[in-house]
Curated annotation (Swiss-Prot):
Name of the protein described by the UniProt record: S-adenosylmethionine decarboxylase proenzyme
Catalytic activity: S-adenosyl-L-methionine + H(+) = S-adenosyl 3-(methylsulfanyl)propylamine + CO2
Cofactor binding remark: Binds 1 pyruvoyl group covalently per subunit.
InterPro entries reported in the protein's UniProt record: AdoMetDC_fam_prok, S-AdoMet_deCO2ase_core, S-AdoMet_deCOase_pro-enz
Lineage, broadest ranks: Archaea, Thermoproteota, Thermoprotei, Sulfolobales, Sulfolobaceae
């Protein structure tokens, strides 16, 4: 009789939200936002693989690929508004810490923060 193979559990954590009344001087600065995403990955104990950014109108969209998943920021300076999504796999990561670092750096006066457990069920 063969033994049962036990697969390691996938631990997925996602923190996402909307940031209001942000510092407009930061929201349109692609290079500054790239640095914020890089530092957020470090704060969340994630392994940064690559960062891509696009200037779209006055705003910027940033996608950071981390070994554990991704971090995104999309900004609308004309509305002092940004959205942020931090998703990571692995018990060693802290997407909440990365999200809150971004909130602080964008100087959001108010924000929503949602958390989702994206772990496996097997």
């Amino acid at each position: 009789m063969m033994g049962v193979v036990s697969l390691p559990r996938v631990i997925g954590k996602q923190v996402y939200g909307s940031l209001y009344e942000c510092d407009t001087t930061v929201l349109g600065e692609q290079k500054v936002l790239e640095q914020i995403v890089r530092k957020a990955a470090e704060e969340g104990n994630m392994t940064l693989l690559d960062v891509k950014a696009w200037k779209i109108g006055d705003g910027v969209s940033i996608v950071a690929i981390v070994l554990e998943s991704h971090i995104t920021i999309h900004t609308w300076p004309e509305y002092n508004f940004a959205t942020v999504d931090v998703y990571s796999c692995g018990s060693h990561t802290d997407p909440r810490k990365a999200f809150l670092y971004i909130v602080k750096e964008l100087k959001a006066r108010r924000y929503t923060m949602n958390e989702a457990d994206r772990s496996s069920e097997f």
